[in-house]
Amino acid sequence: DVCSSDLAVSFSAQMMGCLPVDREGNPLRPMIIWADTRAVEEERWMVERIGMERGYEITGHRLSASYSAAKLIWVRRREPDIYRRWYKMLHAKDFIICRLTGKFVTDYSDASGTNLFDIRAKMWSEEILRALDLDEELLPELHPSTDIAGGVTKAAAEATGLLEGTPVVIGGGDGSCACVGAGVVDEGSAYLVLGSSSWISLASREPLFDPEMRTFNWVHLDPELYTPCGTMQAAGYSYQWYRNALCRGEMEEAAKTGESPYERINRGIMESAPGAGGLLYLPYLLGERSPRWNPDARGAFVGLSVTTGKHDLSRAVLEGVGYNLRVILESMRREREMKELMLIGGGAKGQTWPRILSDIFQMPLKIPAYREEATSMGAAVCAGVGVGIYRDFSEAKRINTIVDTVMPREENRLRYDRLYEIFNHAYDALTGVYGELGAYRKDMGEKHE
C-alpha cells in the first residue's frame, strides 16, 4: 500500500489546458497544454465575439490562445469527430480526480484559467458561453478547492494502493497551490515562482485589473482571496534551452564530476560583470503572456560583439528573465505596495539567480525551507483544510519557514535601471519583426506551439 493511514488526497497541477474526455472519463485526444499557442486564430475570433476589454472585465484575464477556451474552439473547428464525442473538458488534476472518484469536477482556481469563468461571481460565464456558442454541459462542475470530490473507489484503490474511501480533496492549479505553499495567505503578501515558467503574484481580497491588461487574476485556494498575477512563459525554460543548445561542454564536465551543469554555468557567470557587457537577452522562446501578450514574440540576443564571451551570454539569459519579470512587478506595484517577495521554485536554489533578481528588482527576496516543494505543499495544506485537520491556510506559514534573505546591492541599481529601459526599447523595436516571422511560420506550415 502507498500508505496504511491515508487521511486525504489532493492535487496541484498545470493550469489552462484542455483535455476532452468521453462519458467514461477516457481522453479523446492528447491534452493541449498551457504552453501551446496553436489557437491564435481562435483567439482573434473570440476577441471579435466578446471584445478584449469585456473579456478581461468578466474573467480577470485577457482573451488569449494560452487559455482553455481557445483550445476548446480549436478542437471544435479542426477535430469535429472528437468534438461530437466530447462529454467534459478536464484539467490535469481533474482527470486524476475523475479516475479516482468517477466525478467530473474542477475548482475555482483552475476554472479561473479558462477564459470561460466569471471571476467575481465564481461561476461559468453565461455571457461568454453564449457569445462562443458553447454549452455549459461541456464543462466540469465547479467547487471551492477545499471541497471533497468523493472517496477513492475500489477500482482506483486496487490500481493505486490508496485506501478505498480516502477523501479526495479537489485541490487547485499550480499557481494557486504555489501561493499557499509559499505562505502567501494574507492580504498583500507576495511571491515569485522561478520555474520553467515564472510568475509574480500576491494575495488580495479583490481581483486587480491593470488598465493595460498586462496582469490577470486567479482564484486563491482560499475562496475568499484572489491571486492577481503576471506570468512569463520561458523563465527556467530559457536557462534550460541555453544549457542544451550552447553549454555541451559544461554538461559533459558536470557528468564526469556528478555536479549539476547549472552549478558550473553559475560559477562562470560570476566572471561576467552585472549587465553582461551590455548584452541583452529577450526571453520569448514560447511567445509571451504577460506582460507582452504576443504569441509571435521569439527570443533574441541583442548587443553581441567580438568582445562578448560565453559567461556574458550566460549572465544575459538570467538577467533577461529578470528584466521581463520586472515589467510584471512594476505593473502590479501600481495597484499594491510590495516591499519584499517570497522566492520559490527550482531557480531559487543557490545564490546566483536570486541575487541577480534582487538587484534588478531592488527588492529583498525571502527564501523558504521548501522552495521546490511549495506547490505540492500548498495542495497538502488544502487537503488538510478540506478534511478539517487544519483550521485554515495559515498553517502553511508555520510549515514553510524563511531560511534565507537576499538583499539588493545598491551599487548595481543604476546599471540595471538603465538596461531595463533598453530591454523594453528592444522589445518594442522588434515587435514588427515578430509579426513578420509569425506570418512566415504560418505560411510555411511551421508549428506555432
Language-model regions: role of each:
Residues 2-4:
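Short, small-residue-biased leader/transition segments that mark boundaries at the very start
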Residues 9:
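Acidic/charged, solvent-exposed loop-and-adjacent secondary-structure segments enriched in E/D, K/R, S/T
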Residues 13-15:
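Short, small/polar residue-rich loop motifs at catalytic or cofactor-binding pockets
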Residues 22-23:
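Short, acidic, Ser/Thr-enriched surface-loop or helix-capping motifs
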Residues 36:
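Carbohydrate-associated surface elements
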Residues 40, 47-62, 66-105, 115-133, ...:
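Active-site core segments that coordinate phosphate-bearing ligands/cofactors
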